[in-house]
Amino acid sequence: MSAIDDLPPLREVIREHQLSARKALGQNFLLDLNLTARIARAAGPLEDATVVEIGPGPGGLTRALLALGARHVIAVEHDERAIPALQAIAERYPGRLEIVCTDARTFDVRPYLGSTKAKIVANLPYNIATHLLIGWLSAEPWPPWYDMMVLMFQREVAERIVARENEEAYGRLGVLANWRCETKILFDISPSAFVPPPKVTSSVVRLVPRTAPEPCDRRALEQVAAAAFGQRRKMLRQSLKSLPTDPARLAAAAGVDPTRRAETIPVSGFVAMARELTNSRDDNKT
């Protein structure tokens, strides 16, 4: 990481560019370059890789990604104040850092990639992290334009992402995430590592897209999961009443006991119910 050593410390960068964290942008800057390097290494070998980073801020993780060999980093930053700091990094790594100043929620990175698969590696702004993740998990067609995500979330959100049936954090997000990806919490980061320190512990999560998830319509899966977890303490025969079909019949046809509750149903059970929901709609059309 010799090239990084030539760049100013991140605290100096923040001071020089007056990058006080803005709560409205969900900013908490990670200044420890050992931790940013650990996050970057969690994405596996970076040599010749294309990496999409959301919310680079002063560029700590950006520097680690480039120093570890990423061929092309696309840094998407909404805060115009951070652009000069990122441009200084780009000068150290000519032709390897592409800076896009825009809102990640409306940004389509695919035209920047062509046929290249990317990795998404980011300390996500907390206020839009779940929104972004759901968008990436909803990508069509599948497999998606990325082959791995290494992302930082609040610990509570990370637990929801990796949760399985019969775990307290299990819900709609866990169903979608684990249907389409293999998920794992890699490590935690203390609030004291950030400026300003958040009130909660953060966790780094790795999501690897499944090549062939169990087949079902994504929208039907989301609809079934939303209904079931909307009244998670009730039996499926009650909680699924908002669906346009008989809930007990739907569950039974999917091989799921309609007296069970959402929190006890594995992802495969939700997939089976989503398929039955799609089938019932098709039957009604004929």
Swiss-Prot record:
Keywords noted in UniProt: Cytoplasm, Methyltransferase, RNA-binding, rRNA processing, S-adenosyl-L-methionine, Transferase
A GO MF label: RNA binding
Positions that bind S-adenosyl-L-methionine: 28, 30, 55, 77, 103, 123
Catalytic activity: adenosine(1518)/adenosine(1519) in 16S rRNA + 4 S-adenosyl-L-methionine = N(6)-dimethyladenosine(1518)/N(6)-dimethyladenosine(1519) in 16S rRNA + 4 S-adenosyl-L-homocysteine + 4 H(+)
CDD domains, sorted: AdoMet_MTases
Pfam families registered for this protein in UniProt: RrnaAD (PF00398)
Subcellular location: Cytoplasm
PROSITE patterns: RRNA_A_DIMETH, SAM_RNA_A_N6_MT
The EC number(s) this enzyme carries: 2.1.1.182
Entry's Gene Ontology cellular component terms: cytosol
Enzyme class: transferase
Family: Belongs to the class I-like SAM-binding methyltransferase superfamily. rRNA adenine N(6)-methyltransferase family. RsmA subfamily.
Protein task: Specifically dimethylates two adjacent adenosines (A1518 and A1519) in the loop of a conserved hairpin near the 3'-end of 16S rRNA in the 30S particle. May play a critical role in biogenesis of 30S subunits.
UniProt-listed HAMAP family: 16SrRNA_methyltr_A
NCBIfam families: ksgA
Protein name: Ribosomal RNA small subunit methyltransferase A
